[in-house]
Each structure stands twice: as C-alpha cells, then as structure tokens.
Curated annotation (Swiss-Prot):
This is Sec-independent protein translocase protein TatA. PANTHER family: SEC-INDEPENDENT PROTEIN TRANSLOCASE PROTEIN TATA (PTHR42982:SF1). The gene is tatA. It is a single-pass membrane protein. The chain crosses the membrane at residues 4-21. Part of the twin-arginine translocation (Tat) system that transports large folded proteins containing a characteristic twin-arginine motif in their signal peptide across membranes. TatA could form the protein-conducting channel of the Tat system. Keywords: Cell inner membrane, Cell membrane, Membrane, Protein transport, Translocation, Transmembrane, Transmembrane helix, Transport. GO terms for molecular function: protein transmembrane transporter activity. GO terms for cellular component: TAT protein transport complex. Coiled coil: none annotated. Belongs to the TatA/E family.
Length: 58
C-alpha cells in the first residue's frame, strides 16, 4: 500500500505539469538542485563562516 507504481508516478507528474506548466518546471528543478547542493555543502562543513570570508577578501 505504501509503494508507488508506474501509473501513480505518471499521474502525479501529469498533475504537476498541469499545475505549473512546461515553462515553470525547469526553473523549479534548478532551484531544487541548487538548494540540495547548498544543503550538502553545509552538511559536510565546507562552508567558511562569514567572519573568515571577510578576512580573506581584505
């Protein structure tokens, strides 16, 4: 009952396409991808704190 089949996934994609339109979906996916990328960087600890960024610019 908790698993999605191919038919259910296709129906969900069709509804998303109807709601957002073909032009808006690439923008949404780009935003999602950049958000996931930032989250992964933060989880790794690769980001330098703001105070250290200011010191390196000077």
């Amino acid at each position: 009952m908790g698993r999605l089949g191919v038919t259910e996934i296709l129906m969900i994609l069709a509804v998303v396409l109807l709601l957002f339109g073909g032009k808006k979906i690439p923008e949404l996916m780009k935003g999602l991808g950049s958000g996931l990328s930032e989250f992964k960087k933060a989880a790794k600890g690769d980001e330098v704190p703001d105070s250290k960024k200011d010191e390196t610019k000077e």
